[in-house]
Amino acid sequence: MNDLIINHIAELILPRSTDKPLKGKELDELNVVKNGTVVIKDGKIVYAGQHTDDYDATETIDASGKVVSPALVDAHTHLTFGGSREHEMSLKRQGKSYLEILEMGGGILSTVNATRETSEDDLFKKAEHDLLTMIKHGVLAVESKSGYGLDRENELKQLKVSNRLAEKHDLDMKHTFLGPHAVPKEASSNEAFLEEMIALLPEVKQYADFADIFCETGVFTIEQSQHYMQKAKEAGFKVKIHADEIDPLGGLELAIDEQAISADHLVASSDKGKEKLRNSDTVAVLLPATTFYLGKEDYADARGMLDNNGAIALATDYNPGSSVTNNLQLVMAIAALKLKLSPNEVWNAVTVNAAKAIDINAGTINTGDKANLVIWDAPNHEYIPYHFGINHAEKVIKDGKVIVDNTLSFKA
């Protein structure tokens, strides 16, 4: 006897399972089954496809008028941080620049101070609250970065919190050491601080899967970033890079040269970098909510990357300064509107390709896969990025069990 059957599904979303990320035109290929059925036993998918009455189960969910998809994958978050920076919104409205806010004690260094002052247990409680919000919105696989400690003690603290979250909630979670995220005030120079972070690589390896660096004007140069990435690979890490967010420094090209698993942001990437994606499996992780939140007009050139047969994914970039959202559904809407992605491209970018960007087996519904699914209160898959700003996730299913039920229930 099977454990659960989800029947009469209006649309069953079945992204294609591949060894490599979907590239170029492949991103627009999505198998959407009308009147579908999913059968689950022992936390695994037994069957997913056209409606069938050939299976029995102890529990049945009628998904008439609903969409079922793989659980979403958020491939770029800064989940563990102390404090918040809502007071900066009024400063920005007054026309204060980032540097002016930084000089007033705000900006990233204020988050660094708050993170350093927050105990590991309190940091865990805050991050857990934010993680549970993600889960309620349909995410069951997450990448979590450090980068607000900027010293040995606090970078380790962030990574330990991330690992504790993964263990407690038994999630598909990957952890990224982003020690070189900024340069703390106490550092004698960018170069000296970078060497401190490189020296930490062997120690943080037990807590982190990836090593990341912020390659940008005023932070770390292309040469420094390459040096760090090479040292990280020597220490056994797969590498990522925050690249070309503001200036076209060539971070995307560097990521491809160093065979990074992903290059993230890429708002200012050059045509040369986009062309180089053609012969690479590096995933371009685009973060349109960041551009939206910062009030900027120029978004990453997703269409140019796809035209060059590149692989792209989408993520929230959840952080307290430039993308204060842990709702990946909102990112899907912004991507459709501002990156000009089709609904099919959006769905692949938050499932199978996002999984490739963090090297996990997720984002698909195939026989034998973990039964990590979302039942959406929506008539079709196009509706979810179309009707933005609310939570469409009705039920979230992890390992075959309903762990979130957002069904509205109230007394008139």
Swiss-Prot record:
4-imidazolone-5-propanoate binds at residues 85, 148, 181, 245, 322. Binds 1 zinc or iron ion per subunit. It catalyses: 4-imidazolone-5-propanoate + H2O = N-formimidoyl-L-glutamate. Fe(3+) binds at residues 76, 78, 242, 317. Its EC number is 3.5.2.7. Zn(2+) binds at residues 76, 78, 242, 317. One of its GO terms (molecular function) is imidazolonepropionase activity. The keyword Iron applies. Pathway: Amino-acid degradation; L-histidine degradation into L-glutamate; N-formimidoyl-L-glutamate from L-histidine: step 3/3. One of its GO terms (biological process) is L-histidine catabolic process to glutamate and formamide. InterPro entries: Amidohydro-rel, HutI, Metal-dep_hydrolase_composite, Metal_Hydrolase. One of its GO terms (cellular component) is cytoplasm. Its main location: cytoplasm. Transmembrane segments: none annotated. SUPFAM superfamilies: Composite domain of metallo-dependent hydrolases (SSF51338), Metallo-dependent hydrolases (SSF51556). It is found in: Cytoplasm. Its cofactor is Zn(2+); Fe(3+). N-formimidoyl-L-glutamate binds at residues 148, 319, 321. It comes from the Bacteria. Keywords: Cytoplasm, Histidine metabolism, Hydrolase, Iron, Metal-binding, Zinc. The keyword Nucleotide-binding does not apply. HAMAP family: HutI. Belongs to the metallo-dependent hydrolases superfamily. HutI family. Catalyzes the hydrolytic cleavage of the carbon-nitrogen bond in imidazolone-5-propanoate to yield N-formimidoyl-L-glutamate. It is the third step in the universal histidine degradation pathway. This is Imidazolonepropionase. It comes from Staphylococcus aureus (strain bovine RF122 / ET3-1). The gene is hutI.
